[in-house]
Every structure is written in C-alpha cells, then in structure tokens.
C-alpha cells in the first residue's frame, strides 16, 4: 500500500516537472541522459534527483523537499524488503497526510518560458511590449535561467547582424530582467565589456557599452573600461571648446558616466564641462544675442555637477582660479550668472573649509564685487 501510494505521488511530481520546464530540470540536475519525456524519468532519474530537481525549479518548496525524502525512506523501510515489518496505521496516515499536503494538493506550477522560444518571439514585431507581462515572465525564473537569459540577450544585442526589431525588443525587456539579477551576475555580465575591448572591434565594443548604459550599470565597469570610454571623450571636449557640435556630442555621452569619472581625468573633465557651460561672448547677424554656448550640452551639465564629489569640487575651484577665459567672461553679468548656477548645484556638498570660500562668495549675489576682486 505504501509503495503504491508513494508511486502515485512520484507520478504527480513528474507531471508537474514536465509542466514547469523539463529543460530547466535538465540544467539543474545535469543527468547522465537528457530527460525528454515521462518515460525518461522512469529510466534515468532516481527519486533523490527527482525531488531535488523539483525543489530547484520551484515545483515544491524547501519543507516539501525534506518531507518527501522522509516519505521515500519510510517507503523503503516498510515496503522495500521482503522481511520488512508492517508500519503502524499512524505512520501510514502521517505519510499520506504529508504527501497530500505538500504534493498532491499543490496546484500545477506556472510554466517557465523557454529561452530559445522567447528569443524567437523577441524577433517578431508582434512581441507584446507590455511591462506587466514581461515582468511576470521573468519574475518566476530561477537564477540559472535569469543568468543564461541576460547573457544571451547581451551577446545578441552586440552582434553586428542583429535585426533592428530584435534589438529594440531587447532594449525593452533587458532593464526589467536586470532588476531581478543578483549583484554577482551583474558584475560578470558587465565585465564582458573588457573582453570585447581586447578583441578590437570598435562597433561591437560600443554596442557593449550601450547595453551597459541601457540597464543603468555603468557603475560596474572596470577601471580599464572606464579609461577606454572616457579618456578620449574628455580629451576631445577639452580640446574643442566653443565647437558646439563637438561639445554637444561629447557632453551627452559623458553625462551617462558622470558618477564614475576616473580620478586621473577629473581635472580635465571639470575644466572642460565648466568652460562648455559658460560658453563665449560674441556677435551674430542671425541672432540678437551676445551670450553663446552649446545648447544641448548646457542642458546636461547642471545634472552632471549634481554628481560631483569632493575631488571634483576642488577641481572646479581650481578651474575658476586659473582659467583666464573664465576670469574674462564672468565680468559679463550673464556669464557670471551661469557660473553661479553651477556653484548652486554643489552648494549642499560644500563644507566650512576655507578653500571653499570662493564658491560661497560666488553663490551670494550680494558679494559679486568681492568675488570678482578675488579672481584678480
């Protein structure tokens, strides 16, 4: 009787695993022979593998896993040997109740997406771009599936022959999947950027950086990856002051990395974005204005200043003190206001140290003369 009932429970467990995901079961258990159907369970999978696999893929919980292993031992003790004694009615009922509670009464688990099939769906223009649907599809995935899926999406996204529809759908789903990943998986994925840098294909490397920005993970970039990306941009920006198209492009790209500027580039970075924001004074036959600056770049720079650390504040003070261009420009009220706007963005981060007095004076409009005198 125990044997028949136990086999009935095992049958139910197999069917629930098949419903959940046989592919995931194989990945978690890694059996000697791949399980493809119900008969393969009988031929290649023992009870311990079945119970452990069911737990790992979310068919049963931790408590149920322990209870079922105890039920297996109970069955072996009392119904696995010709000389076994008969179990007490209490022992039988306890086993029945446990199996009913933890397996038979449990509803069939939700099905897990097949990664290969899901990627095929992403290739289609009919993919349902519904955030709730996507979140539900990802939320139930075990860690091993999430890890595999994010790496697959990354590899597909950076491939030069990936269709635009697939790229667009990857851009839609990846940030939602990223939020569900553990830190270790995020770090391992972002470090793939270093591997692409070494390979030397700039178009693929740029796509790798784009993916990292897409999932808001620039903070995980290695020091060498930051140097690779930011050093040329900072140098180009500094060397092309008042070249608006270049300033607009460089600042827009740098804005995504404002919190991770390498220390050895901070002085040049702060110098460049400060001068870009202040702009220049000139005349135009087309526009009735004398205050000129890169419009697009100027829309990004205030928020970049809000991410300043103490080293960047020091560089800002040094830029104001040493730049002859700024000393000349801030005599004009409009340029002084622009410089003050930048100082206001970091006002909350100022301390009472004496070397910051220059910024305190700059922020106070009543002390304009005192500030200008301090620059001489």
Where are these regions (language model features)?
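Flexible secondary-structure boundary motifs
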Residues: 16-69, 73-74
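Non-catalytic all-alpha helical scaffold/repeat segments
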Residues: 115-376
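Eukaryote-specific, cytoplasm-facing alpha-helical/coiled-coil scaffolding segments in long proteins
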Residues: 16, 34-39, 79, 100-107, ...
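Charge-enriched, short contiguous segments at helix-coil
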Residues: 56-115
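Short catalytic/ligand-binding loop motif for oxyanion handling, primarily in non-cytosolic enzymes
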Residues: 10-11, 25-26, 86-87
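Alpha-solenoid repeat scaffolds
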Residues: 15, 85, 106, 110, ...
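Short, hydrophobic, well-ordered secondary-structure elements
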Residues: 1-19
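"Short basic amphipathic alpha-helical interaction patches in structured regions
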Residues: 3-7, 22-23, 89-94
